[in-house]
Amino acid sequence: MSKEELIEFEGTVVELLPNATFRVKLENDHEIIAHTAGKMRKNRIRVLTGDKVMVEMTPYDLTKGRITYRFK
């Protein structure tokens, strides 16, 4: 899949789930399940409840996403 097809949203982490997975509430009040991107895992960037994050999603499945950035 090319990068142009991805949709990006900002959201807030609501709940921590097992296996580096998170429940994220998006700005449009939808809740999705998201996991951290590989570069975030590699650089050991911690994501905690209440953090504001950038989530990218595929247009084919709008219930799952990937956390690509944690805002400071």
From Swiss-Prot:
Disulfide bonds: none
Record GO cellular component, one term: cytosol
InterPro entries: NA-bd_OB-fold, RNA-binding_domain_S1_IF1, S1_domain, TIF_IF1
SMART domains: S1
Keywords: Cytoplasm, Initiation factor, Protein biosynthesis, RNA-binding, rRNA-binding
One matching Pfam family: eIF-1a
GO molecular function, one term: rRNA binding
Domain S1-like: residue ranges: 1-72
Subcellular location: Cytoplasm
Complex formation: Component of the 30S ribosomal translation pre-initiation complex which assembles on the 30S ribosome in the order IF-2 and IF-3, IF-1 and N-formylmethionyl-tRNA(fMet); mRNA recruitment can occur at any time during PIC assembly.
Function as written in the Swiss-Prot or TrEMBL entry: One of the essential components for the initiation of protein synthesis. Stabilizes the binding of IF-2 and IF-3 on the 30S subunit to which N-formylmethionyl-tRNA(fMet) subsequently binds. Helps modulate mRNA selection, yielding the 30S pre-initiation complex (PIC). Upon addition of the 50S ribosomal subunit IF-1, IF-2 and IF-3 are released leaving the mature 70S translation initiation complex.
Family of this protein: Belongs to the IF-1 family.
NCBIfam families: infA
Protein name according to UniProt: Translation initiation factor IF-1
Provenance organism: Hyphomonas neptunium (strain ATCC 15444)
